[in-house]
Amino acid sequence: IAAAPTFQSASIPAIGCSCTNPAVTEANPYYFRVCFLDPFQGSVMANFAKDEFSAANAYVLSMLGEDYGSGLATYFVNAFEDLGGTVTSEQFPEGTSDFSAYIQNAINAGADVIFAPCATTYAAQIITQAASAGFDKPITAGDTWESSVILDAQKGTSVQVYCSTFFDENDD
């Protein structure tokens, strides 16, 4: 997003391979992308939660002031509510390392699923702390969770983790 005005004012074409936020290329005839957008990603993950887990209640946790996570959270919330689901949303401040209160809030809200579009550093902490709290429902997120950091955090726990991804097993 920050570089878009530079590309536009200099008439330099740019192609983003993983910039899922619609604002990145908005109103810029020189900026293109090759990936899906967050409105699609949020909707897919909301439908996945409803279809795969019969989720009626979702708990959404994103970082305050972070464009990617806040935007993706909004798209998920809108889609999940359109599907008839109920959502409890919270945001955590940058630098948070103790997510136990948020996990407890998810449990208290009767969450059938957590959707947490955030950086992998926070994701790993959310996963391990959810496991410690005994949270036994799926934790889902967007494309940033496609990382070995997530696999390492989940390893040895019973926490189910799912994320959207650009991977296509049928693509040669």
Locate each region found by the language model.
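Active-site-proximal beta-strand/loop segments in catalytic clefts of secreted hydrolases
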Residues: 17-20, 35-37, 61-66, 91-95, ...
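Periplasmic-binding protein-like
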Residues: 1, 13-17, 57-62, 110-120, ...
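An alpha-beta-alpha
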Residues: 30-94, 113
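Structural motif
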Residues: 41-44, 91-106, 172
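Extracellular glycoside hydrolase catalytic/binding regions
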Residues: 10-47, 162-168
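Beta-alpha junction/loop-to-helix N-cap segments that form part of ligand/metal-binding clefts
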Residues: 1-26, 34, 92-100, 121-124, ...
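Loop/turn elements at helix/coil->beta-strand transitions in domains of secreted/extracellular proteins
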Residues: 9-14, 27-30, 53-58, 82-88, ...
